[in-house]
Amino acid sequence: LARMFPFYKSMAPDALDIVMLFGVITLLAAGLIAVVQDDLKKVLAYSTVSQLGYMVAAIGSGAYTAALFHLWTHAFFKALLFLGAGSVIHAVHSNSMLEMGGLRKVMPKTFATFIIGTVALAGLPPFAGFFSKDEILASFNHEGEITFFFIAVLGAFITAFYMTRAVSLTFLGEYRGHGHPHESHNLMTTPLLALSVFAIASGWVNICLLYTSPSPRDDL
């Protein structure tokens, strides 16, 4: 879509509104589906679809650089979350969050890095997701798409909600599963620590406003 933007701009500008509409619908619908999932990996999978909706909507608003920026930051914190989920599943031998809980004490590295990924995905500063998601919201505001702007903001709150729910069911409270979970080997936790750095710092590349510019749709 980003590569085809010049074509849409010159030949079919009305198609950009359709692209933006489908992106906004996707980010909201996938986020709502993630709220009701009990499988940890499914939560992250639908979350990925929701974030792709943000990227598609950004392209529709003309902010294709912001979309690619979000693709860049999202790659790091979502990889961190999926690897963290893998570490948890390896420990408890189940994907269901209903059979987890209380893992914060026995899996401190996994817990800490999962929190970093969660905060980055929720878009809180100074984590990576804040910078890229903020550019997308700014593009809606710049284009005067106030309805889409508030839907995207609602999507951000939904993201924070389902990830807070996932953290609570997985790491807090009492352990509801079977066996004796333990922290994963360093071969699994070292990549988590490395990705945590990028989940925090990958958004800082936009401090010089590399991805911030007037919308290419201004001259349509």
Model-derived features: positions:
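Hydrophobic transmembrane alpha-helices and their helix-loop junctions in integral membrane proteins
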Residues: 1-192, 196-204
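Conserved small/polar residues in nucleotide/adenosyl-binding loops
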Residues: 211-216
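N-terminal low-complexity segments that are often proline-rich with Ser/Thr-Pro
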Residues: 219-220
